[in-house]
Curated annotation (Swiss-Prot):
<comment type="function">
    <text>Catalyzes the transfer of a dimethylallyl group onto the adenine at position 37 in tRNAs that read codons beginning with uridine, leading to the formation of N6-(dimethylallyl)adenosine (i(6)A).</text>
</comment>
<feature type="binding site">
    <location>
        <begin position="12"/>
        <end position="19"/>
    </location>
    <ligand>
        <name>ATP</name>
    </ligand>
</feature>
<keyword id="KW-0808">Transferase</keyword>
<comment type="subunit">
    <text>Monomer.</text>
</comment>
<dbReference type="InterPro" id="IPR027417">
    <property type="entry name" value="P-loop_NTPase"/>
</dbReference>
<dbReference type="GO" id="GO:0052381">
    <property type="term" value="F:tRNA dimethylallyltransferase activity"/>
</dbReference>
<keyword id="KW-0547">Nucleotide-binding</keyword>
<dbReference type="GO" id="GO:0006400">
    <property type="term" value="P:tRNA modification"/>
</dbReference>
<keyword id="KW-0067">ATP-binding</keyword>
<comment type="similarity">
    <text>Belongs to the IPP transferase family.</text>
</comment>
<keyword id="KW-0819">tRNA processing</keyword>
<feature type="region of interest" description="Interaction with substrate tRNA">
    <location>
        <begin position="37"/>
        <end position="40"/>
    </location>
</feature>
<dbReference type="Pfam" id="PF01715">
    <property type="entry name" value="IPPT"/>
</dbReference>
<feature type="site" description="Interaction with substrate tRNA">
    <location>
        <position position="103"/>
    </location>
</feature>
<protein>
    <recommendedName>
        <fullName>tRNA dimethylallyltransferase</fullName>
        <ecNumber>2.5.1.75</ecNumber>
    </recommendedName>
</protein>
<dbReference type="InterPro" id="IPR018022">
    <property type="entry name" value="IPT"/>
</dbReference>
<dbReference type="InterPro" id="IPR039657">
    <property type="entry name" value="Dimethylallyltransferase"/>
</dbReference>
Amino acid sequence: MDNPTTPIAVVGPTASGKSALGVSLAHHLNGEVVNVDSMQLYKGMDIGTAKLTLEEREGIVHHLLDVWDISETASVARYQSQAIAVVEDIQRRGKTPILVGGSMLYVQSLVDDWQFPPTDPSVRAKWESKLNEVGVEALHALLAQKDPQAASIIELKDPRRTVRALEVIELTGKPFNASQPPKNAPPRWNTQIIGLGTNTEWLNPRIDLRTELMFEKGFVHEVENLVGKGLIADSTAGHAIGYAQVLQHFAGELSVDEMIEHTKIGTRRYVRRQRSWFKRDPRIHWIDASGDTFSMALSLLS
């Protein structure tokens, strides 16, 4: 790269190897990693988010891990301001920011100049009342009628984002995604975006294995501890894949086997949304996640 402080973003679906590649690139390029996974922002959400341990970070500085309390509501706008400050501090110190994660809105908030649409408490209250009246799935179906593209990237059982999308649509008179910047504009800081491409035959077994290992490593105990610190089902963290299923198990709604299987299913569903989102961005340089991703990434960057 001509400019050693130009950020590199490593994006792609869950379980594709982003975190390991980020560490390797940081070693090679004198870089520091900036987390772009919304659930890894939460303190104590470790096993279920595949957060790298200190040993796995191999001495590389990782920013924006463990910054939010478990009861806090996630905010892309708040993340954006924090992350921009971190990236620009890394650049001032002459190092390469390595942005790593697959949380779609968070990635775009960082690499694009995304100005967030307005809020209106009365409009939001109206949609929250509608949510309480009909339930999240019916409200999500209404969103799908108004804005199919927004519905395709918002989890079926995510009441907060469903309400927010409907609020934005009403306030702006435009689709929710119209508030996002076009994906053909130059990315902020001229960030180089590398995508880990996967196929279902390769990725699904990795998802299954990773899920099973999560539970073997004490994931249920992790969630139990977080409940003691304020984790509830009706919260941002409580809607996270895996955590939601364990909470359903605690509530007697899922057996152990169902809890594990539903976590796998939820992860595969999320991966489909990630693929759909990222493939629409022509600025992403794709490499094969099943190959030597480090060598391929360096070739792209040279």
